[in-house]
Swiss-Prot record:
Keyword presence, Iron: yes
Pfam families assigned to the protein according to its UniProt record, in alphabetical order: BATS, Radical_SAM
Function, in words: Catalyzes the conversion of dethiobiotin (DTB) to biotin by the insertion of a sulfur atom into dethiobiotin via a radical-based mechanism.
Organism, as annotated: Campylobacter curvus (strain 525.92)
Protein name (database record): Biotin synthase
Binding-site list for [4Fe-4S] cluster: C17, C21, C24
Cofactor: [4Fe-4S] cluster; [2Fe-2S] cluster
Enzyme superclass (EC): transferase
Keyword Mitochondrion (UniProt): no
Gene encoding the protein: bioB
Length: 279
């Protein structure tokens, strides 16, 4: 029987980011209609983790808004990771907290984090056109430091933000060099508050992106994340015919996802089992 890995997201904090990433509704200066809040309590996140596990999630991603970790935020995320690990030890903890130093990443690993998610987002050449407050090279270095600590790497990006086919190929070459454990694919969803005004990707183009990513990263778990429902619509479950082996269930950081119960029922109908441990 075929197996897929399900991942759920806990947005520990939201909004008020200092960075100007043009594709993100949490970025500086945007007036997007999103929830903005400071750090959730460990108890609140543990409750979310229990619900995620009940919905067959293996991965549980602890996400904070903002450009990077500082020592205080590192300890806060580590505290939450320890609390979740104690109450729901079956979950594979993923941290997604922006740019970080080797020592900060090591602290997260020691707190029970299995994998660090820090997306390159796009090619090195195109990145300055969609973000000016930090560099692609800083993102690259964080990924190298995460690998150096022994954390598994979760690294991918976003498509449909105005990048060329050459940018996509260059981006995938960089991912191939990093050799991540898992690689999320996000499809851009337009928002009136954002600077990017590109048309939505077609379903066929989105699936071609999936094909090219699977080909470039044969040893990685290819995960479809943001934009799955909006871009792929009724054809969203075709992703599994194109080599995808992981999906995000439930809501994303600032956009609604498919209802978990609907996804799970469909996955079962398709004959999938749910991964219960990492390989």
């Amino acid at each position: 029987m075929k197996t897929i890995m399900l991942c759920a997201i806990s947005s520990l904090s939201a909004g008020n980011c200092s960075e100007d990433c043009h594709y993100c509704t949490q970025s500086a200066g945007t007036k997007a209609d999103i929830k903005r809040y400071k750090l959730k309590s460990p108890e609140q996140v543990v409750d979310e983790a229990k619900k995620a596990y009940a919905n067959h999630a293996l991965g549980f991603c602890l996400v904070t808004s903002g450009a990077r970790l500082d020592d205080q935020k590192t300890e806060q995320v580590a505290c939450i990771a320890r609390a979740v690990g104690k109450e729901v030890p079956q979950l594979m903890l993923i941290a997604c907290n922006g740019m970080a130093s080797y020592d900060q990443l090591k602290e997260l690993k020691n707190a029970g984090v299995f994998s660090y998610n820090h997306n390159l987002e796009t090619s090195r050449d195109f990145f300055p056109k969609i973000c000016t407050t930090h560099s692609w090279d800083e993102r690259w270095q964080t990924n190298l430091d995460a690998k150096a600590t022994g954390l598994q790497l979760c690294c991918g990006g976003i498509y449909g933000i105005g990048e060329s086919k050459t940018d996509r190929a260059s981006f995938r070459t960089s991912l191939k060099e990093l050799a991540p454990f898992s690689s999320p694919i996000n499809f851009f969803i337009a928002n009136p508050a954002l600077k990017i005004k590109t048309p939505r990707l077609s379903v066929d183009e989105a699936l071609k992106i999936v094909d090219d990513t699977v080909l470039a990263l044969p040893n990685a778990r290819i995960m479809i994340a943001g934009g799955r429902e909006a871009v792929l619509g009724e054809r969203q479950y075709e992703i599994f015919d194109h080599g995808v082996s992981a999906v995000v269930i439930g809501d994303y950081l600032t956009t609604k996802g498919e209802e978990s119960c609907k996804d799970i029922a469909k996955f079962k109908q398709m004959g999938f089992e749910f991964a219960s441990k990492c390989h």
